Amino acid sequence: TLALMTSGFAIGQMVGMYFKDFFARARPAHYMPGLMTVLPTPGHPSFPSNHALQNELVGLLVMRCLPDNLNACYGDAIRALSDRIGDNREIAGLHFTQDTDAGRQVARWLDREFIGNLDTVQAIVAEARDEWHGSGQSVLRNLPYPNHTTIPACHSGIRVVAGMETF
């Protein structure tokens, strides 16, 4: 799963920087020099937002590998986290709404049109899917729950086994 997320960030970074170079849109602080951004304004163009692109793409990739029951349980939370990261960059004064929207659209375009054609990424998706689907019942590790706690909200029969942490 970590390899899948890392791949999503790397693909998003490369594609996003290509589009940033192509469109060369100035950031909000360049249009409003008095704008006091929360974070330092990056030196590269604003459009599309790479944070929105990368996190939307990673969210889509993670949801590809989750079993249906976990997708039903956590899909909304994954999408909300992805959206929040892009939205926070607008609040910080680093992006316009159009930058964030475009980043998300590019991620969905990549997922729909290209990810399925990349054999290496598909192999990583398959490996991540095996991690989550292992032997018909997913066992979550490294979570601070008591022994053999079932998460009832998911109705999935997920078993959380304490003491099986892998570091």
Where are these regions (language model features)?
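Membrane-embedded catalytic cores of phosphoryl/pyrophosphoryl-handling enzymes
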Residues: D21, R25-F167
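Metal-dependent C-N hydrolase catalytic cores
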Residues: T1-A3, F19-F22
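Interfacial segments of alpha-helical transmembrane regions
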Residues: T1-G12
